[in-house]
From Swiss-Prot:
Coiled coil: none annotated. It comes from Bdellovibrio bacteriovorus (strain ATCC 15356 / DSM 50701 / NCIMB 9529 / HD100). This is Probable lipid II flippase MurJ. Involved in peptidoglycan biosynthesis. Transports lipid-linked peptidoglycan precursors from the inner to the outer leaflet of the cytoplasmic membrane. One of its GO terms (biological process) is lipid translocation. GO terms for molecular function: lipid-linked peptidoglycan transporter activity. The keyword Cell membrane applies. It is a multi-pass membrane protein. Pathway: Cell wall biogenesis; peptidoglycan biosynthesis.
Amino acid sequence: MSHEASGLKEDRKKVLKSAFLMASGTLTSRILGLFRDIALGALFDRAVTDAWTAAFRIPNLFRRLFGEGSLAVSFIPVFMQTQSEDPTGDRARNLANAFYSLLLVFLGVLTLLGIVYVEPLFRLILSSDYALDAAKWELTLRMGRIMFGFVFFVCTYAFYMGILNALGSFGLPALAPALLNVSMLVFTFMPPQWFAVHGDGLAWGVLIGGLLQALLLAVALKQRNYLPRLQKTLWTPEVKAVVRGMLPGLIGMGLLQFSTLVNLYFASSLPEGSISYIYWADRLLELPLSLISVSIGAALLPTLSDFANRGLKEKFQETAEESFLMNLFLAWPAALGLYILAEPIIEVLFLRGKFTVQDVQMTAAILRIYAVSLLLVSCSRVLMPLYYSVKNTKVPMVLALVSLAVHVSLAPVLMRQWGLEGLMISGVVAALINAVLLMGLLKKYSPGIRMSVLLRPALKFVLAGAGMVISLQAYELLMAQTGRGLQMLALFVTILLAVVAYFGLAYVLGCEQISRIRRSSQP
């Protein structure tokens, strides 16, 4: 094996290993988050869960925007370039200090404005029908004021995560949000009489959790001697380069995430519970999405940025192709499983306390539609770093604008026919357009991905998925034998059979992803 081929193999392993570390940390956090959501559905009625979900949308938007968006994709390439040009790390530290100082000023002003003007902000993003319920409206405003401080902490966390990712640390930043979920769980179970208003604890749990996850990464950066410090000189050439790349990316990612606000606005005009149904289905969608696509995309960006800086086009292309195929290989069975087992999954997880059978049916209907979008959104999440790594943030921005325009235009039309489900279908159409355009324009703006390389493995994935679908029918057979009392066991056995069927068939069909997953999980 040549030195170049050996190097490429190590680079691929590095990306997959980084993604595996991120996925491991994310899995821990998501499991805790799932317990939190189960408690939320069982302990609080739909008026409180709607209020909390609506109030959390804004700070959560900033979490997604900065934590999975423009801050990392614009900062990491410039940070890595300064490191390569100055091995001492002094320029990289100066960049981190200057940008951090600028970020703190921006976040301080943003948080203060959000707290002061929370009412007009929520009148903008929620329909007028929502405010007709005075008690729910006041609770939403109260929670919004408490949780807006989370924006400051979560954006600080996202910046710290970007530095650690650039330094090759992926596991701890992915694990840190577990502290957020632990905090929210603790506050969810606190006695209601401890708070002035029923539901306040949900908001305080978010705020304290945001502080804890930022502090954890601050300790990690201090140990590496990269903890940013305040400085007077803010507008350095490197900061200018980050901001130039950040603005289009901020708009592009903002437009993609803005679809959640579009859903919130339209859903707030629908019957009570609609906002909560979207939230619970979205949480189940985010589990495979964050474990697979976000982890791969975040791990891919530093590696591709390095290849782009060194002009290694072939390495760039082959690593991108392998990462895209790995995403398809894992997202495809997740989408199939969520679609076919939507209702039993919701029943096992949530059907208790104040979560009713009607809640199960409505949430499951949304989850099935989200399962279709999982493949599309996951592909987009892996394709976008291919643009960002060559410092092109404008194309994803324009494409996000196109898909958002489609969603906003189509949603009211489909809602008249199918209500809440029509709103979700509109989002799927928009996601399809975004993914197709990202793939179609890729070769023009980066080394790209060769379709000929994708077709044969993708066909194998489809065949393995077909076998998995057959194995999923075991759920109905098991339920006929065991009854509702052992539903959780029946669901667990069915999922286990499906996993064995998919990966077993993939192995028989010769899917290389099996061996790559095994190697990446080794220390």
